[in-house]
Amino acid sequence: MKALRAAAAVVRKPSLLITTLVRPPEPGSLAHKAFTKGARANVWIYRRTGGKVGGKLDGTPLLLLHHVGRKSGVARVMPLVYLPDGDNVVVVASMGGAPKSPAWFHNLTSTPDTLVEIGRERRSVRARIAEPDEKAALWPRLVEQYPPFAAYQQRTERDIPVLVLEPR
């Protein structure tokens, strides 16, 4: 049944096939640098249009997550797929199924109080890792909304973290 739902999603959104099959670029590689520049361009466009352009990935909503480098202290912004969950917002530290969690995840575990932008709205939030039972309830909804998450989890040995961003 899961495979059938994933196949149906790919038929509706062919670009999901690429995001499901292609591994994330290695940090420091030319492809990674291009991805980083693309993310910065997406942030710029998102902000200028209030998320009307650059606010969705294959029909899935994106937010802009602010975080501060735990080593560098540099403020950064990352566009991420998110799932609304009542007053909370849920994000996934998948990094395309890479062996390591993304830097923004480690940054949020060091400095959990942060800001997200959803459209033109800015929200102060506190990040926390979802409890196992909470993740078990959220994961099917996340995969339904963005099917590549299932492939990302199969691609890696690590348990992909799910973060709940709660209003402050």
Give the positions of each predicted feature.
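A generic local structural motif
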Residues: G50-G51, V77, A150
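Alpha-helical membrane-targeting segments
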Residues: K2-P61
